[in-house]
Amino acid sequence: MNKDLVIYFSVYGTAKMTAEEIAKQTGADLMEIIPEVPYDSSRDHYNALARLAKKEHDEGRRPAIKNELPIKDYDRIFIGYPMWWYTFPMIIYTLFDQYDFSGKTIIPFNTHMGSEDGGTYDTIRELEPGATVFPGLPIEMQSAERGPEKAVHEWLGKLGI
């Protein structure tokens, strides 16, 4: 039997809601990717967050991860994140820089406002050539906010999970 983990990064909570639903439907353990320096989660400051995300991306920053993630203890790992500037947040690059996913199965999922996965699933395949990367779930942010249950159930069914 596979030992499953759902890890996610979320500022506004939509990736978190989706992660929680995946963990619920699969029985996987659940862990948040916590940045060393927290992002402002106030929706009133969305534009400031967008500018910061763009700056991190343009400068190739790798924000530090505060918590230890027990990647080595799991066989199958769901990785979730929001889309920022048509890609994943730079802290996800930090995740792939810090942890070895060789021999693991990675199942990505993301929330978005129209950009689908933005090619991030292919980027994960490039960053982690020793891992098996399953087809991901891009879920529109408003759909996630209304409840990701159906989308998650259908996606997991297509994956045979």
What does each model-found stretch correspond to?
Residues 1-79, 86-88, 93, 97, ...:
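N-terminal beta1-alpha1-beta2 submodule of the flavodoxin-like/Rossmannoid cofactor-binding fold
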Residues 6, 79, 108-110, 135:
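Structural beta-sheet core signal
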Residues 32-34, 110, 137-138:
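Residue-level recognition of beta-strand->loop/alpha-helix junctions
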Residues 39-43, 118, 143-146:
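Short, charged, surface-exposed secondary-structure boundary motifs
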Residues 71-72, 97-103, 126-129:
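Short, conserved loop/helix-junction motifs that constitute active-site signature segments
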Residues 110-115, 141:
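Short beta-alpha junction loops
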Residues 114-127:
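Glycine-rich, charge-decorated loop segments at or immediately adjacent to ligand/cofactor-binding or catalytic sites
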Residues 132-161:
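Glycine-rich phosphate/pyrophosphate-binding loop and the adjoining helix
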